[in-house]
Amino acid sequence: MTKKSVQNDYLHTILGYLSRYRMLALPGLAVMALIALGQLAGPYILKQIIDVAVPKEDTGLLLAYAFAFLGIVSVTGLLSYVGMMLLARLGLSIVTLIKQDLFSHLLKLPISFFDKHPVGELMSRTETDTERVRDMFSNLGANLIVNVLTMIGIFGVTFALVPRLALIMAGVSVLLLTVLIVFFSKIFSMYEKARSFYAAIVAKVTEFIQGIEVLKAYGRTGWAETELDAAAKQRVSLEVRISLIEYTMMSVLESLIGPLFIVALLLLYAPKVLTGTMTLGMVLLFVEYGARLLRPIAEIAESLRSLQQARTSLSRIRKLMAIAEEPNRGVGKAPSLDREIRFDHVWFAYEGDEWVLRDLSFVIPKGSFAAIVGASGSGKSTIISLLCGFAHPQKGHILIDGVPLDEIDIVAWRKHIGLVLQESFLFPVSVLENTRLYHEEISEAKVREAISVVHVDGAIEALPEGLATNLWERGANLSSGERQLVSFARALAANPKLILLDEATSNVDMTTEKRIKESMDVLRKGRTMIVVAHRLSSVLSADRIFFLSGGRLIAQGTHES
């Protein structure tokens, strides 16, 4: 993609969001134009006071100009407030929309995407980067619009009075802006690198907090601190370099070029006052306009710096939004499970890896209890992922009543699945909402029935507020066995057609395992159930047992056979 096309895409994205909130953007733009007009009118009124009211010694005219000046300053201040409020609301509205679009897109990405991207990196995209974009649409946008309109107004008024001076001002402004634009384009890569350093730090902090138990248990908190400190120092070093370059440029502009420009104006036009070819008010107007011209140039330069950062953030967001969503070719095709689940010569491998499943074929009739047994790495859990549509076979087909799974609406299909993993995730919300996952159609009575069936009702009722008790992070105020039983209750409350248990009993004690086996007897009634297990002893009651080794089906049958 060429630099021009990237720029066009960038502008297209900005205009796309602005068009959706034009009822805020257009009034905001109009107010910014009035503010720029007010900033031009103030110095002109002072010129009239010096050139007209004072020579005439007309007190009434002097007071009229003074009140006009006061009125313009007051109205400009009020308009600044209104304009900032409009653009702040615009920025909030747009960033909310971006966050909604981004989060909605994240939810539609395949599971494999989340395996490759740290949580901290995604948090940086959804929060930090979006807030920078918000700043672009509110504060930066307001400053840039006012400054650009002010510059245009200064050129216009000056050209009407002294065309030669207007051309000089325009030439100096174009030269300075060109230098600044080239300067900021050269250090754009430094901004991108600084943002990547920040994202890496957020990712490290997130990972270290998630793995705090392991770090403490192995005495590696010191190493984690050193790692984070090194990453922070790397970022600080780069940020200091960027700031040094920026401040050097801005200091040259404000402390050297600005005063030289004002002195040049005075040397050029002050003598004309002595010869009577120009009024004192006119000279002071040009000096004031000259000073006001340099200020917008400096502020535009500062805005360009922040806009570059916002552009980097928007670029990251757009890259994330461009990632292909999870395929769902069967949208609208309602799934069913009236006869069987069939694996027909299925081959599967993870990206760039060896085959995990090799020419796998088997049939699981509706309403049966099937067990998949094998050593670690034999492909058992991969079968669960394929059935959930989290991954897709490279060769062969998974058929639901003869229909390929990739031709069924995968979102609708998942609603018929009750999934219990080896380590099921519990949210930091109430036990009630953890069990029904905010499905309002699942009543509290249904939830109570489910937790009773899986024999975790006693533990839940012992909590301070029973079902209404908020769980700690990852359900830490429950034992591991209780957490797993809540996951079983979640599967039961959803009343699915298909139950998938992936090593659901491998991390629990004997008492909890006994409860789980009793729960499985209830869960399987009227449903199809597939259980992945290491130990054959945990699935003795299965209707059909499939033995995997190296991704191949090496045997199948009942326990008796």
What are these regions (language model features)?
Residues 41-43, 47, 141-184, 240-284:
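A hydrophobic transmembrane-helix motif
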Residues 34-38, 42, 70, 75-87, ...:
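Hydrophobic alpha-helical membrane-associated segments
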